[in-house]
């Protein structure tokens, strides 16, 4: 949510501001290189016209009008010359240096300086000359056997174009001798295997082996990963893809050995890393609960739970874990999952207030409140033990206010009634300002969203938009809540109209612009729990409006 008050969603945005570009110094474009953007920088001013007198500067051949309207023809044909082998001295840079670096060192250590010059170099730069044609492309007649026999397999695997060649010619048939030759050469040395996994190109050929490995090869690959820094592989941008593919494609018993190795190490960094988080998500999603029960027990400890939930990536992992634990109660392992879920939810409820006030952890509490099925009992516990008696303070917090909104929306009738009563009558008025909780929230930058949610709930009920069918006594209670909010808004309408949030509150109340009733008289047609066109007036007059309800006072 956002409005002019500056409230934004608590999830961090990845977009960047362009204000820096709008105020950038554009003197470099004014046609003068004296001073300006270059006067105080370390960027060298190259004299590409030579060091001699300007009257001896190079002059191009004169041109005449060509038959082609888009071209000019040279009067004096130029003589073809060999490749130019220029040095810094040819540009007046014989004594050029940056700090203590020579020109050669400067260009070697500053790839951005030479990046534009070398941008036309093909991706086949790592391939041997015999493997490419005159255009720099891989030869059409090249075979996989040629690559292996010439000892260029690693060169191809580390090259973007070369690895595509290997993937196209990969021998998927386990009976093919070349399959075993490739596997042995790429995995026999731990350093080579690790380098390929961490390479932007090489990881693809390793994934290919993972996908088509025999059971024996799967065992060997698992040993290679465990012996060559499994945690580091999970944290790497490219190697983590190999681990994910292994969990997805390997036999379950073999994949569980990878997870067992992770559980024996310090895997807390994996829970908060942008790359490693995908590995753990694969584990939770694809493997049986017995493989990752250690992770749930790890989260049940308060310090670990707070560390993971307060991370932008970790909070999503916790949500997925809760979802998997509460999923499909008909499975035979549900009792085990329910025990682990109960331990995790106990820890969440115990730290609910701190979690709700955090930028990312509040999403975990929201997720519990919005879940259904077996999670409803934990939703009610969180509302009763954490939110009640703290609604006013939490509604004024940037992140906890999201939790309060969700609680109003998903609370069962009895708890919803208690929450409404707390806002209306649960706090002593301020002695100096004579303001109660509703007055405070109406004008608060975050609390006003809670009031808007209260209004929305009342309107949905009174217009018959609620999924469940409500009795008349419940409808009267919703009408009473709506009437109290409307009277308070009317009292402060002059001040509320000064703010965009106040205008939204006034507009939302106008959606139900009909006088309220709080008497025991039969309900008016507009307040019936179902659409009027579906109910006859004769049926409504016979309704008994005095049925008992959990809302009856």
Swiss-Prot record:
Gene3D superfamilies in the record: Leucine-rich Repeat Variant
Is Phosphoprotein there in the keyword field? no
Would I find Cell division among this entry's keywords?
yes
Q: Which UniProt keywords apply?
A: Cell cycle, Cell division, Cytoplasm, Developmental protein, Differentiation, Oogenesis, Repeat, RNA-binding, Translation regulation
One cellular-component annotation, GO:
nucleus
One GO biological process term is: cell division
Q: Where in the cell is it found?
A: Cytoplasm; Cytoplasm, P-body
Source lineage: Eukaryota, Metazoa, Ecdysozoa, Nematoda, Chromadorea
GO function terms (MF aspect): mRNA 3'-UTR binding
Checking PROSITE patterns in the record gives: PUM, PUM_HD
The disruption phenotype is: Production of viable embryos and predominantly normal oocytes with a low percentage showing misorganization. Does not affect germline development in adult hermaphrodites. Impaired repression of glp-1 and fog-1. Simultaneous knockdown of puf-5, puf-6 and puf-7 results in abnormally small oocytes, disorganization of oocyte nuclei and cells, inefficient yolk uptake by oocytes, embryonic arrest with impaired eggshell formation and cytokinesis defects, impaired repression of glp-1 in late oogenesis, and mislocalization of rme-2 to the cytoplasm instead of the plasma membrane.
Q: Pumilio repeats span which residues?
A: 146-184, 185-223, 224-260, 261-296, 297-335, 347-384, 386-421, 432-472
Q: Where would one find coiled-coil regions in this protein?
A: none
Superkingdom to which the source organism belongs: Eukaryota
RNA-binding: annotated segments: 499-514
The UniProt entry, under Pfam families, shows: PUF
Q: What does this protein do?
A: RNA-binding protein that binds to the consensus sequence 5'-CUCUGUAUCUUGU-3' in mRNA 3'-UTRs and modulates mRNA expression and stability. Functions redundantly with puf-6 and puf-7 in oocyte formation and organization, early embryonic cell divisions, and repression of expression of glp-1 and other maternal mRNAs in late oogenesis.
Q: In which tissues is it expressed?
A: Detected in differentiating oocytes with highest levels observed in developing ooctyes in the distal portion of the proximal gonad.
Which species does this protein come from?
A: Caenorhabditis elegans
Question: What name has this protein been given in UniProt?
Answer: Pumilio domain-containing protein 5
């Amino acid at each position: 949510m956002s409005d002019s008050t500056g409230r934004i969603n608590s999830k961090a945005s990845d977009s960047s501001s362009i204000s820096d570009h709008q105020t950038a110094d554009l003197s470099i474009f004014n046609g003068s290189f004296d001073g300006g953007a270059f006067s105080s920088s370390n960027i060298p001013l190259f004299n590409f016209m030579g060091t001699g007198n300007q009257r001896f500067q190079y002059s191009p051949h004169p041109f005449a009008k060509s038959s082609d309207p888009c071209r000019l023809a040279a009067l004096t044909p130029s003589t073809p010359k060999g490749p130019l082998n220029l040095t810094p001295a040819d540009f007046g840079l014989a004594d050029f240096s940056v700090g203590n670096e020579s020109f050669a060192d400067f260009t070697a250590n500053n790839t951005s300086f030479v990046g534009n010059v070398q941008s036309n170099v093909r991706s086949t730069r790592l391939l041997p000359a015999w493997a490419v044609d005159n255009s720099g492309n891989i030869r059409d007649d090249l075979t996989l056997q040629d690559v292996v026999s010439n000892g260029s397999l690693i060169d191809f695997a580390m090259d973007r174009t070369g690895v595509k060649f290997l993937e196209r010619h990969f021998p998927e048939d386990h009976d093919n001798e070349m399959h075993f030759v490739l596997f042995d050469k790429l995995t026999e040395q731990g350093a080579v295997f690790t380098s390929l996994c961490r390479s932007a190109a090489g990881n693809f050929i390793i994934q290919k082996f993972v996908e088509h490995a025999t059971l024996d090869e799967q065992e060997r690959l698992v040993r290679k990963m465990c012996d060559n820094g499994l945690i580091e592989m999970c944290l790497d941008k490219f190697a983590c893809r190999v681990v994910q593919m292994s969990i997805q494609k390997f036999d379950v018993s073999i994949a569980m050995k990878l997870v067992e190795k992770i559980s024996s190490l310090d895997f807390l960094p994996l829970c908060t890393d942008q790359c490693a988080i995908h590995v753990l998500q694969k584990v939770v999603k694809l493997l049986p609960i017995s493989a990752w029960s250690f992770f749930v027990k790890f989260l049940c400890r308060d310090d670990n739970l707070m560390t993971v939930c307060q991370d932008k990536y970790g909070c999503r992992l916790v949500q997925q874990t809760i979802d998997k634990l509460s999923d499909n109660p008909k499975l035979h392992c549900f009792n085990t999952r329910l025990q682990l879920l109960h331990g995790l939810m106990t820890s969440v409820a115990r730290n609910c207030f701190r979690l709700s006030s955090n930028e990312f952890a509040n999403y975990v509490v929201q997720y519990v409140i919005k879940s259904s099925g077996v999670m409803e009992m934990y939703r009610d516990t969180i509302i009763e033990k954490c939110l009640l008696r703290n609604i006013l303070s939490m509604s004024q917090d940037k992140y906890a206010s999201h939790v309060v909104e969700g609680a109003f929306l998903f609370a069962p009738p009895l708890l919803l009634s208690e929450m409404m009563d707390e806002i209306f009558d649960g706090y002593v008025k301020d002695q100096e300002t004579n303001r109660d909780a509703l007055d405070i929230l109406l004008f608060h930058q975050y609390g006003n969203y809670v009031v808007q949610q209260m209004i929305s709930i009342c309107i949905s009920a009174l217009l018959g938009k609620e999924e469940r069918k409500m009795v008349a006594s419940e409808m009267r209670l919703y009408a009473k809540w709506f009437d109290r909010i409307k009277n308070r808004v009317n009292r402060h309408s002059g001040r509320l109209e000064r703010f965009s949030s106040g205008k939204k509150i006034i507009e939302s109340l106008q959606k139900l612009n009909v006088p309220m009733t709080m008497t025991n008289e039969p309900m008016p047609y507009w307040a019936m729990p179902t659409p009027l066109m579906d109910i006859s007036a004769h049926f409504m007059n016979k309704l008994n409006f005095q049925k008992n309800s959990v809302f009856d006072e």
